[in-house]
Amino acid sequence: SLWFTITDGEGHIVGETGLLRMFPAWHQTDLTIIIPDPEMQHKGYGTEAMEIMLDLAFHEYKMHRVSIGVVALNTSALEFYKKMGFRQEGVLEEAYYYKGAYSDFVMMRILSREWR
């Protein structure tokens, strides 16, 4: 696994990102990214971090496939991942429990040939 902090122009931490469950023999990995403060979202930090992580996964580590999962309630993240080139593969129904209610969990992926 690889983990990095996401920082603003002044070096303040705004989030984190990582490649998890890297399986070189299978050429696949999972990606995670979180910028928890709504004030720091939609400022380009996520886009820059995602571009760096996908470049690392596909070019440095020669992965063929990168997967990501997101709670269906997080429509902003779903749209962001689609903008970055991820495609929905499936839905885990009622797989996430938050504030007394269940929500679906959306599985997405991007293949190396689809990146840039």
Each PLM stretch: what is its role?
Residues 1-39, 111-114:
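Acetyl-CoA-dependent GNAT
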